[in-house]
Amino acid sequence: MKKKLLFMLIFMFEVSLSAQSIYQHSIGGIGCTMWGVSYKTFLSDHVALSLDFGNQFVQTGGEDWPQVDVYSIELNPNLMYEFSSNSRLHSLIGAGVTLGYNWEMGIWHIWYSGGTRDDYKYLGNGMKAGANVIAGLEYLFKIPLAVQLDFRPGYGVFIKNNVRWHHFDWNVCLSVRYVL
């Protein structure tokens, strides 16, 4: 009985040692409403950290700020759990945050809609913060190239002085990365 238990423990230990992450690091580009640089690293066999840095464009359609264009520079780190459906195709799910700086909030739309000088207090530079979930697929080619397609619904807030504008911040992103 003790030999069987010892054998099973050794076997489980060897199997856990042979389990490896999909790859260690990758770097490339991301395209969606945010265009920029994407870096991904595996922290363990199935847990990955993705850092996306780039420029995002958001066009509003709410009653508070009708048709205002917001541009921002953002950092979007996501912590993901990846599981394999086969050796090359991997599913992922996770969550992340968004931190950024925004500017040029579409002043021409306020002029066009007949806005007053008081409306301009909402325009200008500010900060952006938000949270998102992420779900998608990643395909690893035989060459050192990984392509990821994901959906990122989230909640974002643009902040300038005492004004906060809340919005549904969603993306469908395509990332192409070179595997290091």
Task: Briefly describe each language-model feature range.
Residues 159-165, 173, 177-179:
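Outer-membrane beta-barrel porins/channels
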Residues 20-35, 47-57, 153-155, 159:
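Transmembrane beta-strand segments that form the barrel wall of outer-membrane beta-barrel proteins
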